[in-house]
Amino acid sequence: LKKEIVKLTNEECEVAGIPALYHDVFTSGIHYVDFMFDIKHIRQEDLPYVGLLKAVLGYVDTEHYGYADLSNEIDLQTGGISNNILGTADVENIEEYSLKFEVRTKFLEDKTGAALRLVKEILCSSDLDDEKRLYEIIAQSKSRLQMAIGGMGHYMAGMRAMSYFSKTAKISDLT
């Protein structure tokens, strides 16, 4: 390990008129792309639905793929596509925070077009009206959460306690 800290540079640019950050670092030919959507305007009582959206995007049918075929295509064309909700506190004012919905993917250079088409397919044409499939996903999420609580109850209790004092912890608890 080197003792020096590697300095990262953020290069601000525009891609198709959209603000972007570029990091010129060696990645062995793997491209990492994060799409960030500002969701701070969403009311607090609606945040659990954003958490649900995070859970279902990529796991429901889209315009061109059934969910099983979509999963196979994601595996073939990318190193995965994931969704996250990021709440980060302002370092200068703890009462202020930013809230983003993140869609993250990684892929090899020759798969760029296919990977970005899949992200667009998921974001723009996911079928959120299939109640049976949504129920399956919610039931799976509930089961995973119940199993996690069994092994990490102390962590969950700590996160809930923090949610009473921290806006970002509250967002994490709600989503």
Whereabouts are the PLM-identified features?
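M16 family metallopeptidases and their MPP-like homologs
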Residues: 28-60, 64-125, 131-175
